[in-house]
Every structure is written in C-alpha cells, then in structure tokens.
Regions:
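Sec-dependent N-terminal signal peptides
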Residues: 4-13
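Sec/Tat signal peptide C-region and signal peptidase I cleavage site
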Residues: 14-18
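Extended soluble regions of mature proteins
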Residues: 20-245
Length: 245
C-alpha cells in the first residue's frame, strides 16, 4: 500500500512539474469570416457587393503579451481571398488593440470612417459560463470551453487554456482564467483560432499603447457611425459590433 501511495505521489509531482505556465509570448490568430453571410440579404446593393468580394476571407493577426498586457494587430492577408481595401468602415492593416488586464483598460488605434482615432476606456465586462468538461486541442494546448455574451445579446463561444496566464484574447475579449485560443461569434459569422505560439525571441517592447490618432470617446464615435450605417441593413449592425470590439 505504501508503495502504491509513493508511486501516486511521484506521478502527481512529475505531472505538476511538467505543466508549463506561460506569461510572455506571441500568438498568431487566423480569423475566418463568411463575408456573404455578414452582408445579409437586404437591398439591391448587397448582391452587387457579393459579386465583388470573396465569400470567405482569412486574415492573420499577431497577439503579443507580456506583464499582463497585450497588443493585437494585423499580420497578413491570405492573398487567395483578400477583401478589397476600404470594404466596410475600417481597414484591418491599420488597427491596433492594446489591453492592460491589470487595470482593466484598453487603448486602441482604429481607422474608422476615413479617419484615424485613438480610443481608450474600460475593457468589456463579459459574463462567462464555463463548461470545463468540453475541451479542444488548439495549437498544442488543452483548452476548456466558455460561453459569454457581448453587446447585450451576442453570444461568443471561447476555448481557453490556463497554461497561458494572461486573461486575454483577440481584440477586447477578456475575462477568462487563461488565454483564449479559440473564439467564435456566430452572429458576426467570424471565428478566431490560434495557429502557433512563440515564447522565445519575442520583442516584448512592442507591447506598448499606440500614441497617434485623434482622441475620441468610443460612445461618441459609435453615435457617428450609427448615423452613417443606418441605411446599411444588417451589415450596418455587423460594422458597429466590429468597431466596438
């Protein structure tokens, strides 16, 4: 009996030592969007747009994190299904999201409605429901499922790992006990999936808030955008959600 207990203790200690906890690194996210579904089916202009853009597009973003802070920005397009520049309200090449999870604040640089803005404020407070029994392997990490609600009624489905200690994820999504490596927003017809993680040779000096752009309150910018998108049909709501993430 003593031998069995000793074996269990050794096994548990070995497993604990083997588990890694990562607080600094760079994650590549692949973002896949069904553009035709996002456009909806309201108005003659929708069919015109659908003829000019790919049904699906893949865009890659770089998420660098250190000291409980992160910066998320454009990396590259998949040239086979690249959207034309200027489609929608913003250009992904220009946008930068900086989050400080210790203070619960963000500073974002966004190109919206033809101008560059520096936005800052409090991170979204997302109510999460954890489903730890449902797991998925993403980029070599065992991730647990969680369901949250943003913008009052928009469900998001996330898979996170507690092996990466930063409580973050793509854009402003946050608040789970670990890093979000998989995210789906069905009503936005978009998914985010981590494809790789780099922990060595990462330039953590890049994790600094953007400085340029016109300072503006997000709520005020949302009002301006609402006036512009009021005739855009369902896609107008999509654009407003994307602007607010």
């Amino acid at each position: 009996m003593k031998k069995i207990l000793l074996a269990i203790m050794i096994s548990s200690t070995t497993a604990a030592c083997a588990q890694q906890f990562i607080s600094s690194g760079t994650i590549e996210f692949e973002v896949r969007t069904n553009n035709h579904r996002a456009l909806g089916d309201e108005g003659f202009w929708v069919d015109m747009f659908k003829d000019k853009i790919p049904q699906f597009s893949n865009t890659y973003y770089q998420y660098t994190f250190n000291d409980n802070k992160s910066i998320y920005k454009f990396e590259r397009f998949d040239e086979k299904n690249k959207l034309p520049r200027g489609f929608g309200m913003s250009n992904p090449e220009d946008d930068v999201w900086y989050n400080d999870y210790s203070t619960g604040t963000f500073t974002n640089y966004r190109y919206i409605l033809g101008d560059n803005y520096l936005l800052s404020g409090a991170l979204m407070n997302i109510e999460w429901k954890l489903t730890p029994t449902e797991t998925r392997d993403i980029a070599g990490f065992n991730c647990r499922k969680a369901t949250g609600i943003i913008f009052d009624s928009v469900y998001v489905f996330a898979f996170y790992t507690d092996e990466i200690t930063v409580s973050g994820g793509p854009m402003g999504i946050n608040g789970l006990p670990g890093m979000i490596l998989g995210l789906t927003i069905p009503r936005m017809f978009t998914s985010y999936i981590a494809t790789k993680l780099q922990v060595s040779g990462v330039d953590v000096r890049a994790v600094t808030p953007p400085q340029k752009g016109k300072k503006k309150d997000l709520a005020s910018l949302q009002k301006d955008a609402l006036r512009v998108t009021k005739d855009w049909g369902k896609y107008g709501q999509q654009a407003l959600w994307m602007m607010s993430l």
